Amino acid sequence: GVGAKLSKVIADNPHLLDPAIRIILEQNFLKSVAEYYSKVFERLEFREKLRTFFTKYDLLVTPTLPVSSVEIGLNVPKEYDKNALVTWVKYTYPFNLTGQPAASIPIGFSRSGQPVGLQVVARTRREDSIFDLCQQLENIMSIYSRQPNIGKY
């Protein structure tokens, strides 16, 4: 995987990698083959659960992120562990793992004026249903006529 391709960079030039990514890769180098395949099978089980879910439902709609924005220069919002990248992308990460098609569109603004995203997820090979819903939402929300509060972010 990516870790194997970057192993030489990690060994010779670790400063070239984002610290949070480097930590994740280094932690994964410590895992045994059995641990690795255990995680692969967990992912496959989760993918099967989603496949079953999408036999009953056409789409799943979630917030894109649990926060409206991240301060410039940070990889993770201040209220989350700076080395735990996936903890704050908990709404998008599962679908990256399973390969589900998904889209995120701006849906409104937070109290502070920062944009808020809505994620739309579909069953495999049903991107058309995502595009249809996103188009309908964009048409009725008129979100693009408003500007976010630039502020300190």
Tell what function each PLM region has.
Residues G1, S38, S69-V89:
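Short, surface-exposed loop/helix-turn segments at secondary-structure junctions
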Residues G1-R51, P63, P101-Q114:
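Short helix-loop capping/hinge segments that flank enzyme active sites or metal/cofactor-binding pockets
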Residues V2-A20, V89-K90, T124-N139:
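Short, basic, helix/turn surface patches
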Residues K31, Y37, E48-R51, K56, ...:
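Structural helix-boundary/capping segments
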Residues E45, P77-K78, Q135-Q136:
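Short, solvent-exposed amphipathic alpha-helical segments in soluble enzyme
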Residues D58-L60:
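Short, Asp-centered acidic motifs that coordinate Mg2+ and/or phosphate
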